């Protein structure tokens, strides 16, 4: 509802910033917790914010240095009508131990669960006007974690591919020890989703909960300096875009197997904001995903950017990708939210286009 005040966590990050832009465009007033003045300044100076030029009454910031601390959001939630919790307080810098180290559980699972419970507790105790909390979850929260690593055998993946998972799918939370940071991340998403849903069920607060479950998010990142964000994604998919490969010749060898799921950042942001509307029922979830074949990345890019391939800026070849299909039922996204999800073709065009903008190669 236009004019309502939204507390947006994660608003200084990739997805959260895109949500922020969508909120402002749709007339919401937004309060963004930030860890530092530097992060606030970076958002204020970003191109879309500068172009929209929202008044101070429509874009506000509050310093929250430690978002995992008990009561961290107690002040931020006051007088707020709605909350979008897109922050993911994962302490990856602390997860430096060997695989299975307890540090993985603390850095990923504990941090993520505490983040979700912290915002819900603050909303329950201090946010008396809050009517809805929209949380960013992930498809990895509701699929077997082994599908996203090498732990699943080909036979297990083949059998799993016959299953169509949807917004009501739930899986047991994988227990430690964790084999890798990716395994711990999947566990963190499953555990934090369960913790949030259990909290709503056990406490019956004055607000409801909607979970948005995107797959791998692709899209422009205005806040990234250089090609740090786009390059990280594209360097694995498109030979010639690895900023760490000075010769542009040795990168992209070997075999890579990955789940073929992707979604456009703008679509994910739109889903979060649309979920705030009063005509959308609470206490439900939405899965956002488009099937992707990583093997198609170079052919798609060649179609949209032929000159860059002719010049040698991008090169055909690279690693041999094997796409693991993982099926999702996303019908609610269009039927309920009215969002038609972008194709993988659109994602590649947008991300490669931004890469060229940031490198001045257009």
Question: Where in the sequence are the language-model features?
Answer:
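Active-site Tyr-X1-5-Lys
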Residues: 170-209
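A conserved pocket-lining segment of Rossmann-fold NAD(P)-dependent short-chain dehydrogenase/reductase
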Residues: 174-180, 220, 224-263
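Mid/C-terminal beta-alpha module of Rossmann-like enzyme folds, strongest
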Residues: 258-259, 269-318, 350, 359-362
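N-terminal Rossmann NAD(P)H-binding glycine-rich loop of SDR-like oxidoreductase domains
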Residues: 3-33
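Conserved Rossmann-fold NAD(P)-dependent oxidoreductase catalytic core, especially the SDR/UDP-sugar
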Residues: 85, 94-103, 107, 111-180
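NAD(P)H-binding glycine-rich loop region in Rossmannoid oxidoreductase-like domains
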Residues: 35-114
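Glycine/proline-rich active-site loop of Rossmann-fold NAD(P)-dependent oxidoreductases
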Residues: 203-206, 219-235, 274-285
